[in-house]
């Protein structure tokens, strides 16, 4: 449980270390996260900080959301996220305040959560890394077919969870243990080592690593 940031994936590039080693990195743009609500044990049964970021057209904001943002004294954002926190982490936080990239430091290990790219309906080879069947030796139309999916009369059915063709991607994915390479407070940008989930422009959540 820790406060994190909601940002937007800008894409990947690379940087060079002093030794000349190329390091692949992902750039995350983090607009100021505006605090819309602070939840406490007394009022909500748990402790959390609720934030919003970005902008949304007024015509796209419901009346309930307008009231919620107005009560907090912040502009309507494109999404609302919550971070479970401890009592100590609530200190100094107040509704209407902001959280920026200075929350993190260079060298800190973080977990990044995003929505993976949707691949549509895919077969077993692409979806589950199944091996293909023989290219020749009498095989004509079954090169990428799954093969047997069950047993015989007993149990006479395909077990739940069997790896088969189906929808791939477009799901919530968390990549753990990424190192922060750079924190640019002037541009509100985080640079993390390695790849993160989702397409360019997608929303991501950056949290202190749970296994660090």
Swiss-Prot record:
Chain intervals for the UniProt region annotation (Disordered): 136-155
Family named by the database record: Belongs to the universal ribosomal protein uL3 family.
UniProt entry tagged with the keyword Cell membrane: no
InterPro entries associated with the record: Ribosomal_uL3 (IPR000597), Ribosomal_uL3_bac/org-type (IPR019927), Ribosomal_uL3_CS (IPR019926), Transl_B-barrel_sf (IPR009000)
Recorded coiled-coil stretches: none
GN (gene name): rplC
Purpose of the protein: One of the primary rRNA binding proteins, it binds directly near the 3'-end of the 23S rRNA, where it nucleates assembly of the 50S subunit.
Descriptive protein name: Large ribosomal subunit protein uL3
Record-level GO BP terms: translation
UniProt GO molecular function: rRNA binding; structural constituent of ribosome
SUPFAM superfamilies in the cross-refs: Translation proteins
Example of a GO cellular component annotation carried by this entry: cytosolic large ribosomal subunit
Modified positions (N5-methylglutamine) in chain numbering: 153
Entry annotated with the keyword Transcription: no
SUBUNIT field: Part of the 50S ribosomal subunit. Forms a cluster with proteins L14 and L19.
PTM text: Methylated by PrmB.
Assigned keywords, A-Z: Methylation, Ribonucleoprotein, Ribosomal protein, RNA-binding, rRNA-binding
NCBIfam families: L3_bact (TIGR03625)
Gene3D superfamilies from the UniProt entry: 3.30.160.810, Translation factors
Organism: Acinetobacter baumannii (strain SDF)
UniProt xrefs under PROSITE patterns: RIBOSOMAL_L3
């Amino acid at each position: 449980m820790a406060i994190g940031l909601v940002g937007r994936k800008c894409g990947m590039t690379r940087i060079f270390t002093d030794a000349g080693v190329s390091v692949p990195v992902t750039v995350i743009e983090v607009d100021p996260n505006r605090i819309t609500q602070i939840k406490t044990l007394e009022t909500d049964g748990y402790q959390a900080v609720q934030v919003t970021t970005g902008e949304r057209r007024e015509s796209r904001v419901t009346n309930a959301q307008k009231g919620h943002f107005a009560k907090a004294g912040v502009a309507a954002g494109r999404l609302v996220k919550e971070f479970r926190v401890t009592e100590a982490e609530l200190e100094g936080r107040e509704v209407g305040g902001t959280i920026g990239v200075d929350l993190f430091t260079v060298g800190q290990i973080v977990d990044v959560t995003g929505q993976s790219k949707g691949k549509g309906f895919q077969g077993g080879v692409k979806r589950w890394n199944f091996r293909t069947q023989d290219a020749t030796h009498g095989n004509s139309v079954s090169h990428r077919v799954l093969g047997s999916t069950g047993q015989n009369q007993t149990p006479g059915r395909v077990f739940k969870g069997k790896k088969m063709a189906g929808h791939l991607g477009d799901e919530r994915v968390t990549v753990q243990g990424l190192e922060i390479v750079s924190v640019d407070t002037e541009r509100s940008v985080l640079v993390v080592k390695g790849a993160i989930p989702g397409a360019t422009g997608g929303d991501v959540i950056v949290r202190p690593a749970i296994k660090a």
